[in-house]
């Protein structure tokens, strides 16, 4: 007796094989997707030796990091003492930050990026939050315009009259606004950022830079004025480094 099977029967192994192939492809993609997710997460953390730019900015493993949630005195800024006189709070803040990171690996966790392309980071040395330490020692304000993270540390510093809280001190953001308003009056078209060329390369100076007053712009040498920090960076200039 001749037994006949339908064509559907013979197609079933092929169908099952195709299903198996698809399943294997899907399974193979799962670890790939997990790897991509981990890589994206790893990109939000940088670790390495740090170089201090100023009291609230570091270079870590080639990444420019603005310490998130704090605002340190500018390099040219002075603050009032307990009873009389002033002290160079901007220089002291930068030097203290250098002490905190010197000889250590620094790990910074990203909280995003600012308009200049700098990572906004919370940075740690041996597990200790150095952003918090700068505020706690009275060497930076809690930058409450953008973050409430370090309000408690600022209250502690204020109560102890530590650092900037021992006398009168204009918050760094007010100091910058005042210096910019003053500098733009004498700058071409109100563009107050000085683009200087030195043996160390093309460097720009903000009106609150410690060397701003002494820098003379010579256009015939290729030096120039900038209207914004973003413009200076886009043109290939870098900020002056404190250390």
Each PLM stretch: what is its role?
Residues 3, 97-117, 160-184:
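A broadly tuned preference for mixed-charge, low-complexity surface segments
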Residues 15-30:
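Hydrophobic membrane-insertion alpha-helices, especially the h-region
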Residues 26-39, 176-181:
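Short, basic/low-complexity N-terminal boundary segments at the transition from targeting/disordered tails
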Residues 33-143, 151:
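Electropositive
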């Amino acid at each position: 007796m001749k037994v006949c099977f339908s064509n559907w029967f013979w197609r079933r192994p092929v169908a099952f094989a195709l299903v198996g192939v698809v399943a294997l492809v899907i399974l193979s993609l799962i670890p790939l997707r997990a790897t991509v997710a981990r890589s994206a997460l790893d990109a939000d953390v940088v670790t390495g030796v740090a170089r201090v730019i100023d009291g609230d900015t570091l270079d870590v493993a080639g990444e420019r990091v603005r310490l998130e949630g704090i605002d340190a005195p500018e390099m040219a800024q002075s603050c009032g003492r307990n009873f009389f006189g002033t002290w160079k709070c901007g220089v002291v803040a930068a030097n203290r930050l250098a002490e905190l990171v010197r000889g250590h690996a620094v790990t910074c966790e990203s909280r995003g990026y600012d308009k200049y392309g700098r990572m906004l980071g919370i940075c740690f040395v041996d597990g200790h939050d150095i952003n918090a330490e700068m505020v706690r020692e009275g060497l930076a304000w809690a930058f409450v315009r953008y973050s409430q993270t370090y309000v408690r540390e600022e209250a502690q510093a204020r109560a102890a009259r530590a650092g900037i809280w021992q006398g009168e001190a204009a918050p760094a953001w007010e100091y910058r606004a005042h210096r910019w308003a003053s500098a733009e009056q004498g700058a071409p078209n109100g563009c107050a950022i000085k683009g200087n060329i030195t043996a160390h390369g093309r460097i720009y100076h903000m009106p609150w830079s410690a060397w701003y007053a002494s820098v003379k712009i010579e256009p015939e040498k290729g030096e120039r004025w900038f209207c914004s920090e973003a413009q200076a960076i886009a043109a290939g200039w870098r900020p002056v480094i404190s250390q």
